[in-house]
């Protein structure tokens, strides 16, 4: 958690991002530099798959070849770091807005639209003024730090968690409580949960919110409740 007079940053900070890029680039460089020796050692084992490619790697000799494989390894490390960071969440909190930053995506929510903030297991939830969920995102931060950050900027924190938790019901396909449109979205979202398609899971959650349906998950099981009004439009933008 990073804090100054104007804002607090929780989750993945810029410092952590820098060190992740640096560490994986160095590791990739080292592996690339020593890959011919690693391949030679692997070929000494009683059985190893991909023997042909490994023999090709052992044919790389000399300082120039080692430098090229090291650069390739460093590029692979940077690419892997970029892929990891794109899945991690940072939250920038000010007195007036909360920004959810994941990769190049930024979701901005104004403080006037936020009624309550709480943690649901590892997920950070922002509740709107009429009971709808503005955001439900998994965050890599200690709950005590999350609570401290939001209280510091005068947001209402729910120590006991979701005040609507007793209203959630497990989704049953084609049950009469929901419209056909809501069932279609929940069915598609259930498949996305099974396939671990995170973008689709979130997109369907937002579409359900426009129907006045709040949804939460336990594994691939979905639980839902109705909100009193539709959520406001949420500002989306591009990150750094």
Curated annotation (Swiss-Prot):
Keyword Membrane among UniProt keywords: yes
- How does this chain sit within the bilayer? Multi-pass membrane protein
Where, subcellularly, is it found?
Cell membrane
Name the InterPro entries for this protein: CysS_C
Q: Which residues cross the membrane?
A: 16-36, 67-87
Coiled coil region boundaries: none
Chief localization: membrane
Q: Name one GO cellular component term.
A: plasma membrane
Membrane in keyword set: yes
Key words of the record? Cell membrane, Membrane, Transmembrane, Transmembrane helix
Official protein name in the record: Uncharacterized protein YqeB
